[in-house]
A protein has these predicted regions:
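Membrane-embedded alpha-helical bundles of multi-pass transporters/translocases
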Residues: 2-394
Length: 394
């Protein structure tokens, strides 16, 4: 049943399955693109088109810092958008089309060298991040507007995370190397894979946009947000501050674990091939963690689900350390460690998305205005900042 009140929530109760699954399907394509950039862009720049590794490392750090704070601006722009299509759909369409084009450009060799190659790499990488943000912030900001029913919100929060994990963690991280080799390897493999991913991205987001509810919020003349108002939102919404702190601490821990994994298997276990067993099992486990999230919250509570999410990764890490020193070539135990770590991550992703959706409702109660864009931009800001500083530290 659709909501006819002034609230931004579209459905009072159950969300139609068509809307729910088509919305989630959009995350598959967008995280295929994100996974390709996150996993392979550095090695593509340094090993395929021969950009100096020292330059790429510094450029990536600066670009991620800029991209993180750019999220706040995009969140503000989304919240200020007034159009006949609402405040989310226009940016989903614009961001998807531009980002797909820039993504293909990233994996296209224009046979440059020296300074011109460094400039090219910098421009396309920064542009990719900015155009991805145009689409990503409004995508996640839709969730709190779909329903206020707690059980339905948990389901609609988890589904896109599942598709995102399938795209980024399972397909790209798990099988990306094999796919690139199968498509010709070297530059040809990267370029062909990029074309396939870009086409998939446009298709999945088209399915998402076409099936979104026609009723959209923010077509009126409410006062527009200014940049300084972002800090007012953070200051007056105490639940937002706590949610951001929890997400920050969790991301620091989990990104540090995953960031050192390659070096751990290479230098502690002396077996870099074990990384594959760890990553594939971990990728599957993340999806499983997301799948069981609604059941866990129903049987226990969201609080206990989050405590499980915080407890499982350290347990998996301790097991991994023991395996590394006692039996470094033991594939089953390495896989089990990966499963324990990323099952917790799956639960955390579900918790974080639901927390932020609830924070939007709380903010409307406290401030009298819904700030979906700003609230969800803080999550992506945290993820990008922790990724940048973790990579620099490692």
């Amino acid at each position: 049943m659709e909501n006819n009140s002034n609230s931004g929530v579209i459905y009072q109760g159950k969300i139609p399955n068509r809307v729910k699954y088509c919305f989630a399907f959009g995350a598959l394509g967008k995280d295929l693109i994100y996974g390709m950039i996150a996993t392979f862009s550095m090695i593509y720049f340094t090993d395929i088109i021969k950009v100096a590794p020292a330059f790429i490392g510094s450029m990536f750090f600066v670009a991620k810092l800029w991209d993180a704070f750019n999220d706040l601006f995009m969140g503000m722009i989304v919240d200020n958008t007034r159009s006949r299509w609402g405040k989310f759909v226009p940016w989903l369409v614009i961001g998807t089309l531009i980002n797909a084009f820039v993504f293909i450009t990233v994996f296209t060799d224009f046979h440059l060298s020296g300074v011109s190659l460094c400039v090219f790499a910098s421009v396309v990488y920064v542009l990719w991040g900015m155009t991805y943000t145009i689409m990503d912030i409004p995508y996640w900001s839709i969730i709190p507007n779909l329903t206020s029913d707690p059980e339905e919100r948990e389901k609609v929060s988890v589904l896109p995370r599942i598709f995102a994990s399938i795209g980024q963690s399972l397909i790209i991280a798990g099988f990306g190397v094999q796919i690139i080799k199968g498509l010709g390897g070297n530059y040809t493999g990267y370029h062909r894979f990029a074309l396939i991913i870009a086409a998939t991205f446009i298709f999945t987001m088209a399915v998402c946009v076409i099936n979104l509810p026609k009723k959209q919020q923010a077509t009126g003349t409410a006062e527009k947000m200014k940049f300084r108002d972002i800090f007012t939102v953070i200051k007056k919404n105490d639940q937002l501050r706590w949610a951001v702190l929890l997400i920050l601490l969790y991301n620091i821990g989990i990104q540090a674990i995953m960031g050192v994994a390659t070096y751990y298997f290479s230098y502690v276990c002396n077996n870099a091939g074990m990384l594959s067993a760890f990553m594939i099992s971990a990728s599957v486990a993340e999806v499983v963690g997301l799948l069981i999230f609604p059941k866990v919250t129903k049987l226990l509570s969201r609080k206990k689900a989050f405590l499980m999410a915080c407890t499982l990764p350290p347990i998996g890490l301790i097991l991994l350390l023991i395996v590394g020193f006692v039996c470094p070539s033991n594939i089953p135990l390495t896989a089990i460690a990966g499963i324990i770590v990323k099952t917790g991550t799956g639960l955390e992703l579900g918790c974080a998305t639901v927390f932020l959706a609830d924070v939007v409702d709380y903010g409307e109660y406290v401030l009298g205005v819904r700030n979906e864009g700003v609230v969800f931009s803080l999550q992506t800001l945290i993820v990008k900042l922790t990724a940048a500083f973790t990579a620099l530290a490692i």
